[in-house]
From Swiss-Prot:
One of its GO terms (molecular function) is magnesium ion binding. GO terms for cellular component: cytoplasm. Binds 1 Mg(2+) ion per subunit. May bind a second metal ion at a regulatory site, or after substrate binding. Mg(2+) 2 binds at D11, D143. This is Ribonuclease H. It is found in: Cytoplasm. Residues 2-151 form the RNase H type-1 domain. Its EC number is 3.1.26.4. The keyword Oxidoreductase does not apply. Monomer. GO terms for biological process: DNA replication, removal of RNA primer. It catalyses: Endonucleolytic cleavage to 5'-phosphomonoester.
Amino acid sequence: MSQARFIAFSDGSALVNPGGPGGTGYVVLDRARPAYRFGGTRWVEDGPNAVTNNRMELRAVLEALEGLPGGEAVQVISDSRYVVDALSRWIHGWRRKGWRTASGEPVLNRDLIEALDARARDLSVTYTWVRGHDGHAVNEVVDQLAQAAARGVAGPGEAEVVAALRAEAFLAGGPPAPRSSRA
């Protein structure tokens, strides 16, 4: 793991892909305090921006980065190769080619990718891929948050988030209750 001040775990879910409804889940840890926040959002979209798994994955990263102070280092951890590759590798070529893929097609989810690119300019963001459903406790919690948001039901609460952060040694001792929040 990097020594970034913020670690943002994110996941997205589409119950019907494409078409939704979908949900996002995230946990953001501020290692300088230590403090954390977590949440998720239910999404229903149609038309050209219909809910897909990839759109929900991108939205989850946007939600995680929201409100972070500029100039800070952030490590985004995702189980989506699409998110990690799109935002750390492919984006450079897409920009050079006028937002076209190698085959000349328009880049899908350009609106969200450009929004993330703009947000990342104010931060020092690195993207790390982890295998989903492979024992990463915080990744499992954000998956549950995204699934619950997509279904419109309550997801994991603070106790589950704290347990996951402790399991991966991101938190020691008790939870930073005075500074934690649910979005």
